[in-house]
Amino acid sequence: MGILGLSKLIADLAPQAIRESEMKHFFGRKVAIDASMCLYQFLIAVRSEGAQLATVNGDPTSHLMGMFYRTIRLLDNGIKPVYVFDGKPPDLKSGELAKRAERREEAEKALKAATDAGDDAGIEKFNRRLVRVTKEHAKEAKELLTLMGVPYVDAPCEAEAQCAALVKAGKVYATATEDMDALTFGSTKLLRYLTYSEARKMPVKEFSYDKLLEGLSINSREFIDLCILLGCDYCESIKGIGPKRAIELINNYRDIETILDNLDSSKYTVPENWNYKVARELFIEPEVANAESIDLKWVEPDEEGLVKFLCGDRQFSEERVRNGAKKLMKSKQAQTQVRLDSFFKTLPSTPNATNAAKRKAEEAKKSANNKKAKTSGGVGGRGRRPK
């Protein structure tokens, strides 16, 4: 689910935190990608360039086709991806998972009705809702990535949290996912639409964590409370409080405890046994592997291994797989080129640091104006007559 309404709230109130770019803008960047999100996107694909998307036994292969060609495209554009796979979901997520199971049951009933009625559009719609990423899909994807020479990380818990940890440790530039809660976990950069197909022509949308905090006039702790009010995977939200009201409450009271002390109980009903404090701690201290100790290596692909894995029962074209392997090799050789800014260490900015920089800039500007005034308009000066 991510965070309900967060993307629009940022677009409305902190538009400076969002930048749209072409994929090539991220040349030379290392990016942590939410693998489960990618696999889901690939599994719901009906076709990919006219190729078969199933084995001879009818098992889906669209996740492998998507992973193979989309990863090649990223590397072609000079991006070095590392895929992060989900581990065991936190206990707090059980409520959200139960809701998903209910929606799945409803989709199964709706699919049966659509099938009985011969409703092709309905059949496609509800089939998509029944798609889920299994352990087998993830296992196959990891095997493929190993053969491609692309690293992956097994997160102990939530992939978005692990991606954010890699970003904060300076191992990668950004998190690539469609789930906005990567920002709640503290990822300083979030990329959306990075793994979308080229045919969709969607520019990559980059969110800056520091700029959104500045634009919303809140700090990181207050941002977490805002996300809980908006609605997250780990606890219920207060019914009736939408995005606009949520940011107003945070700006006025700064935390959920003070909001609850001042909330109009005749208008809003707080969920019984609301475990927002546990959800908050999960965002502050998520279960992640030590990012500092994770060694990311991009190595040469195993062409023969790829042919053996993807062709045969999985029915991939050997010619296309070999062409893909050659592209991987070419991109590996081109990785000696680096971004100019990679030679400089960028210190993480904070709202306080940003405000201090603004004040310094304003003072410098004022000082320069004063000097200019003295030079051009002082006694005995031969300044220009104002036009």
From Swiss-Prot:
DNA binds at R47, R70, E158, G231, D233. Mg(2+) 2 binds at D179, D181, D233. Residues 346-387 are annotated as: Disordered. Pfam families: XPG_I, XPG_N. Keywords: DNA damage, DNA repair, DNA replication, Endonuclease, Exonuclease, Hydrolase, Magnesium, Metal-binding, Mitochondrion, Nuclease, Nucleus, Phosphoprotein. Gene3D superfamilies: 5' to 3' exonuclease, C-terminal subdomain (1.10.150.20), 5'-nuclease (3.40.50.1010). The keyword Amino-acid biosynthesis does not apply. Phosphorylated. Phosphorylation upon DNA damage induces relocalization to the nuclear plasma. Its main location: nucleus. Binds 2 magnesium ions per subunit. They probably participate in the reaction catalyzed by the enzyme. May bind an additional third magnesium ion after substrate binding. Mg(2+) 1 binds at D34, D86, E158, E160. Belongs to the XPG/RAD2 endonuclease family. FEN1 subfamily. Structure-specific nuclease with 5'-flap endonuclease and 5'-3' exonuclease activities involved in DNA replication and repair. During DNA replication, cleaves the 5'-overhanging flap structure that is generated by displacement synthesis when DNA polymerase encounters the 5'-end of a downstream Okazaki fragment. It enters the flap from the 5'-end and then tracks to cleave the flap base, leaving a nick for ligation. Also involved in the long patch base excision repair (LP-BER) pathway, by cleaving within the apurinic/apyrimidinic (AP) site-terminated flap. Interacts with PCNA. Three molecules of FEN1 bind to one PCNA trimer with each molecule binding to one PCNA monomer. PCNA stimulates the nuclease activity without altering cleavage specificity. HAMAP family: Fen (MF_00614). This is Flap endonuclease 1.
